Amino acid sequence: MSMRTEYCGLVTEHLLGQTVSLCGWVHRRRDHGGVIFIDLRDREGLVQVVCDPDRAEMFAAAEGVRNEFCIQVKGLVRGRPEGTINAGLKSGRIEVLCHELNVLNASVTPPFQLDDDNLSETTRLTHRVLDLRRPQMQHNLRLRYRVAIEARKYLDEQGFIDIETPMLTKSTPEGARDYLVPSRVNAGQFFALPQSPQLFKQLLMVANFDRYYQITKCFRDEDLRADRQPEFTQIDCETSFLGEQEIRDLFEDMIRHIFKTTIGVELDATFPVMPYSEAMARFGSDKPDLRVKLEFTELTDAMKDVDFKVFSTPANTKDGRVAALRVPKGGELTRGDIDGYTEFVRIYGAKGLAWIKVNERAKGRDGLQSPIVKNLHDASIAAILERTGAQDGDIIFFAADRAKVVNDSLGALRLKIGHSEFGKANGLVEAGWKPLWVVDFPMFEYDDEEARYVAAHHPFTSPKDEHLEYLETDPGRCLAKAYDMVLNGWEIGGGSVRIHREEVQSKVFRALKIGPEEAQAKFGFLLDALQYGAPPHGGIAFGLDRIVTMMAGADSIRDVIAFPKTQRAQCLLTQAPSPVDERQLRELHIRLRQPEQPKA
């Protein structure tokens, strides 16, 4: 008989009366009146093994096993006695009567129980091998595998070719920091790990591969958050001779296919499309969570002439904004709730949080409860009530500052209230999945520190055809042929139509204050390739980690990556990064400089 004939979790009634050989880990061992029960676990689940004392050698071995011992069991599959069936297990109607038990490897006492749900992340990541044995982690990583398989199936059916691009490439520091790799052979020179395969996939389109994809690692040396890692995985795609709408349709179908085949979710037949300007106006975010039924009301123009300087000053400032957020039935929020929200928005740079409770709208000013009403004239109050559509029992929150602060703070408040217990109880948030496309992004953003425009996405995104003239006259007016797929407030994919003409690419570089010499030094290979009949092309990249995190309902992408880094970009399992010896540094022509000590 083979070492293993079945997986533990797949032993069911169809094997009744058969002898099986199982391998796995002792999940739990129980001694009940001379009979030993072992819950044996493998990647497919659990099965109950019964060890009778009739077989002395086997029973002695069973007495010695403990949690996480790796064992082999041979035995007879039989039905469980009446009253002992476990409906919560796939194998819950049967058990295996053990004939032979072999300890393949003993285990020291684990630092935690695998069913302990209150472990710190530090403990879990330090002992990641044991953490990965937990059923939830097994589920998450197998879900990740299925998502990748379904993406490959779809792309293969659509004629895409899986082509690998280099991991050691050229540093082009436009955006996040590169991870640099010193060259031993070329002293003083460095490779960079790719932030994306962007330029190589464009070159593959010029090279006539027409449709490319790969599921690949990318690297960015940036500060980490719950949805960030220094190395992450993209489903990276590029295609020739398709327009923006056709590209969106193609990959919208892919995401629908993946969700249906992996978790049985039918996403909308057509994803709504929202311009960037509308998303910012209504939600203060370019990745709006459409499950939350709260929206901004624009008040900037109505607050220009009020005596209340908190509102009028930003209303009359070039980059200022005044916006309101009406919360239906929010009148029942306590002063403690409001104070908590006030502290919350300070995280996003807001100086405070103005509010008005609408007790009886018909009474006008007298029907309102607020510390700011006395500072507003009747026309302003009427405009606020009219524009927000406020009803009796509502509360209206206000933000007035630079537009970025208003968008960030009021946008975060919108999500916090919507997803709160209050929001759920009052129907302010829907369950389910709410995808959309956000389009027509600004081509450039102005960087005050550098006193120049920078690319909002990357410098290879094509401007809209009707905005080409602005590249040389008014870059700030340029909109891009860029598109992001957003799902429940997360950007899961982003892409664009690319620039395929060398003269347009050179104009974009000039708009970014990248001169001809610098452009040739950094991107000469691309500019040269674009001169050889480069086809119109575009593409998209999806964050595999993010998609699986959402599907699994996980708290962090670290829960869907086998060996992730911490928020300090460290691997607690291997203790990477770590020092290297002097000989290695000499071979790489590197001398370390001691970090400066803080002054006393």
UniProtKB/Swiss-Prot annotation:
Gene name for this UniProt entry: aspS
Annotated positions binding L-aspartate: E174, R220, H457, R498
A GO cellular-component term linked to this record: cytoplasm
Keyword Cytoplasm found: yes
Keywords: Aminoacyl-tRNA synthetase, ATP-binding, Cytoplasm, Ligase, Nucleotide-binding, Protein biosynthesis
Location of the region described as Aspartate in the Swiss-Prot/TrEMBL record: 198-201
Principal location: cytoplasm
Record HAMAP family: Asp_tRNA_synth_type1 (MF_00044)
Family: Belongs to the class-II aminoacyl-tRNA synthetase family. Type 1 subfamily.
Gene Ontology molecular function terms on file: aspartate-tRNA ligase activity; aspartate-tRNA(Asn) ligase activity; ATP binding; nucleic acid binding
GO BP, sorted A to Z: aspartyl-tRNA aminoacylation
Subunit structure: Homodimer.
Top-level taxon of origin: Bacteria
EC number: 6.1.1.23
Protein name: Aspartate--tRNA(Asp/Asn) ligase
Coiled coil: none
Function comment: Aspartyl-tRNA synthetase with relaxed tRNA specificity since it is able to aspartylate not only its cognate tRNA(Asp) but also tRNA(Asn). Reaction proceeds in two steps: L-aspartate is first activated by ATP to form Asp-AMP and then transferred to the acceptor end of tRNA(Asp/Asn).
Binding sites annotated in the UniProt record for ATP: R220, D221, E222, Q229, E491, G543, L544, D545, R546
Important for tRNA non-discrimination (site feature) positions: H32, G83
CDD domains: AspRS_core (cd00777), EcAspRS_like_N (cd04317)
Entry keyword annotation includes ATP-binding: yes
Organism: Burkholderia mallei (strain SAVP1)
Entry's localization field: Cytoplasm
Catalysed reactions listed for this entry: tRNA(Asx) + L-aspartate + ATP = L-aspartyl-tRNA(Asx) + AMP + diphosphate
